[in-house]
Amino acid sequence: MKRLATLSLLFLFLGTLAVLIPKEAKGQSAGLVSAVLNRMERNRQSLKSLRSGISMEKYNAQLRDTDRYNGIVLYMPAAGRDASVRIEWQSPQHEILAVSKGKYTLFRPRLNQAIVGNKNSVKGKAGAGGIVEMMYMSRQQLEARFQPLQDVREETLWGNVSTIHLTLVPKSNSSFKYAEIWVDSLGMPVQTKIVEKNDDATTMRLTGLEKNVKISPDEFSIKLDANVKIVKG
C-alpha cells in the first residue's frame, strides 16, 4: 500500500493550495510571513487547474536509502472534498493514480491490476494518519493543531526557483513530526517535505507548472480493460 501513502502525501501537498496556514509567531519575520500568506491566498483564489511534472523522494531512515519517482500530475480543485487528482508515474515503474468524486483508482499495468476504493479510506491504510484531513481543516482547526510557523526564510531551490520556506509542527500527537513547505513568488507551494516519527521522509517537487489550462474531467477517470483484475482498497 505504499502508493496509497503517496496519495495521502499528495493531498497534503496540494492541500496547501487550498487551506490557510496558522497564525505566525509574533516577532518571527512577521512581514515575510504576512507577504507569503497573502500570495498563497491569491494563488488559491485564482487556481482553477494545474498540470505539472512531479518528482518524489522517499527516504528510509533505517536503511539510509532513497527511492526516487518521476511523473506528471493533474489537479482540479472543487468544492468540499471533491478535488480531482491524477498522477501518472513514469519511473521507476509505470503506474496511474486517479482520484475523483471521493473515489480513487490505482492502476498497475505491469500487474494488470487496479486497486479501487473510497478516498477517505486511504488515510487508515496508508500509515499516514491524519494527513488527508489537513486538506479540509478550517483555520481554527489548523491553529488548534499546529504551533506557530517556524524556520521562515528565503531559499532558492534547484532550477533557480526562489521560494519562502515554512515549517509546520503539530501541537499534539500526529503521525508525522513536521512538514516543510516551499512557496514560490506567486504563492504556489512548489515543494513539500514530510518527516515521520521514525525519521522517514517524503519530499515532493512540482516543476514545469501550467496553471489554469484546460483539463477534461475524463482525465480523472481510468478506463480499464475487462481483463484487468480489480482489488478493493
Q: Which residue stretches match the model-derived regions?
A:
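C-terminal segment of classical bacterial N-terminal signal peptides
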Residues: 14-24
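A short, amphipathic edge element
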Residues: 34-35, 139-151
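Extracytoplasmic/secreted envelope proteins and their assembly/folding machinery
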Residues: 34-37, 41, 129-132, 180
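Beta-turn initiation residues at beta-strand->coil junctions
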Residues: 56, 107-110, 193-197
